[in-house]
Design a protein with these regions (language model features):
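Acidic/polar, low-complexity intrinsically disordered N-terminal segments immediately downstream
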Residues: 2-7, 14, 32-166
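Sec-dependent signal peptide recognition
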Residues: 14-20
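Alpha-helical transmembrane segments
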Residues: 21-25
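C-terminal motif of bacterial Sec signal peptides marking the signal peptidase cleavage site
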Residues: 27-30
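Ser/Thr/Gly/Pro-rich, low-complexity flexible regions
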Residues: 149-309
Length: 309
């Protein structure tokens, strides 16, 4: 015969009951998982980013052939290759991908700027393929503004002779000039060739002094290593007859294709260390003096033009 015996609710029994209820609640709640979301776990490619959103490099040395852009990541354990897209013009080539070595937190993306023209401002962008990065935290695109510039180095002092603007009845009017060279290029600047206003007056008159005067004449040696060009024209500081009648020293072919053959008269003499210029002297809208008045540059270390001419 079964006899019911009432148990005493000691503190030990109460603790057991409470523990059982807690375990039941945990088991019940663990079954209700329909609203849980996947937890984000970083992997090596999701950390890749450009280090700058905008890159402005407008003084790239003209002789430089590549330009480096840095990418970074926070998880360097594994090697990874990241795809890159570019909107840069065809004169600049960018690789289609960049690789991080295992253990490295940075990678260098080198773009080829060897065909980038000097003086022109180039704009474009580079972007990381979205499948390789977490766009919520990474700099996915970097915008670039690039330009090349010559690095000018002084060669020292030379001499400048101008048969039209500086020579007078009593003097050759030869002027001391600083000569600069573009580093890595056969390109030169003759600095302040018409700074001597008194000599211009002696050659012409005070009434012929104008307001436009070239701070330098920039010229370059052509690929035939004989002829030189200066592209457009320079101002000699003189006017012919009142305002707006500047006397300009044109590259003949720039003034007119009719005079293109006269370009060949302008030559460098490396043996004598001189350059002969035959500009077409012209006043816009009026006419000119043709190419019969040459100019001569004696390089630093070249001859004294008083004796040479």
């Amino acid at each position: 015969m079964f006899v019911y015996t009432q148990k005493k609710f000691t503190m030990k029994n109460i603790f057991k009951i409470a523990s059982g209820i807690a375990i039941s609640l945990i088991l019940f709640s663990s079954c209700n998982v329909e609203n849980l979301k996947e937890t984000y776990t970083p992997v090596e490619v999701s950390e890749v980013s450009f280090t700058q959103a905008n890159i402005n490099a407008t003084s790239i040395p003209a002789s430089q052939t590549s330009f480096d852009i840095v990418l970074s990541r926070n998880t360097p354990e594994n090697a990874v290759t990241v795809n890159i897209t570019s909107t840069l013009p065809s004169s600049i080539t960018a690789p289609a991908s960049v690789s991080f070595a295992a253990g490295e937190t940075t990678a260098i993306l080198s773009i080829n700027v060897s065909k980038m023209p000097v003086g022109a401002q180039i704009k474009g962008s580079l972007s990381i393929d979205e499948s390789f990065a977490n766009k919520n935290v990474a700099i996915m695109t970097t915008s670039l503004t690039l330009a090349k510039a010559y690095t000018w180095v002084s060669l020292g002092m030379g001499q400048w002779f101008d048969n039209l603007a500086l020579m007078s009845a009593s003097s050759y009017g030869i002027q001391p000039v600083e000569v600069l060279k573009a580093e890595g290029f056969e390109r030169y600047r003759i600095m302040n060739p018409y700074a001597n206003t008194n000599q211009l007056i002696a050659s012409w008159s005070e009434a012929n002094i104008g307001t436009n005067r070239s701070a330098y004449i920039e010229f370059w040696v052509l690929p035939n290593d004989l002829n030189v060009s200066w592209g457009t024209f320079w101002y000699c500081g003189l006017i012919y007859d009142g305002a707006g009648t500047d006397i300009k020293a044109y590259l003949p072919s720039y003034l007119s294709a009719t005079y293109a053959a006269d370009d060949a008269k302008s030559q460098i003499d490396r043996t004598d260390k001189v350059v002969w210029f035959y500009p077409y002297w012209y006043i816009d809208g009026l006419g000119g003096f043709g190419t019969k008045y040459p100019c001569v540059l004696s390089f630093p270390g070249g001859p004294n033009l008083e004796d040479y001419l």
